[in-house]
């Protein structure tokens, strides 16, 4: 007989497995899931589902690339390296530096995560008692729960990597003077 496959918004290994176990299809196609995290299948197979960067279904960068043929490549809100993998390759630094990251939204979290993976010592300061910033808030809207989940997942990833996270902490000139970081990055909006 014919092979049957299914695609579209199948975003987790659990959902893909459930569909396959129902024996209604022979194959599950997960395109956007693998744009968001090119190691999706490897991580799922290894049982590292907490490390997967899940697609949030925003359809911004991936669809824009199909609609605008002048774009050099498609992009992804969850995978800033998409289409620029070689340029964004992570290498360990030979000179670890202390970097003060002001803001615990997704930009600050991503900066801290990448810095830590490169061997630096990021100190992430969030002025409130919650990480995730506006992405967390946006995830409260109907049908946007993936945004909230992504913000929570990024916070957990930063914690697992050992990022020094300081909640209810505003970056001040006095703090900068005390810590004497090599660099300060501002990753918040107001």
Question: Residues of each region from the PLM?
Answer:
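Beta1-alpha1 glycine-rich phosphate/pyrophosphate-binding loop at the start
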Residues: 2, 101-167
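Conserved small/polar residues in nucleotide/adenosyl-binding loops
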Residues: 1-8, 189-190
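Cysteine-cluster motifs in flexible loop/terminal segments that predominantly coordinate metals
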Residues: 41-95
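FAD-binding core/adjacent interface of flavoenzyme oxidoreductases
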Residues: 56-68, 90-92, 164-188
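Glycine-rich phosphate-binding active-site loops on the catalytic face of alpha/beta enzymes
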Residues: 25-40
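Conserved acidic residues
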Residues: 3, 26, 182
């Amino acid at each position: 007989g014919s092979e049957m496959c299914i695609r579209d918004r199948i975003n987790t290994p659990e959902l893909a497995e459930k569909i396959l176990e129902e024996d209604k299809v022979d194959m599950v196609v997960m395109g956007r899931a693998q744009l968001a995290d090119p190691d999706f299948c490897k991580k799922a197979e290894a049982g590292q589902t907490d490390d997967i960067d899940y697609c949030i279904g925003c359809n911004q960068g991936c669809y824009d690339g199909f609609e605008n043929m002048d774009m050099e490549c498609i992009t992804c809100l969850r995978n800033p390296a998409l289409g620029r993998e070689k340029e964004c390759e992570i290498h360990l630094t030979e000179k670890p530096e202390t970097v003060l990251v002001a803001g615990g939204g997704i930009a600050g979290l991503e900066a801290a995560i990448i810095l830590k993976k490169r061997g630096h010592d990021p100190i992430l300061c969030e002025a409130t008692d919650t990480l995730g910033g506006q992405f967390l808030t946006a995830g409260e809207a109907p049908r946007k729960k993936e945004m909230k989940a992504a913000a929570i997942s990024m916070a957990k990833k930063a914690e697992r990597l050992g990022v020094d996270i300081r909640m209810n902490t505003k970056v001040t000139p006095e703090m900068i003077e005390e810590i004497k970081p090599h660099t300060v990055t501002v990753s918040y909006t107001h």
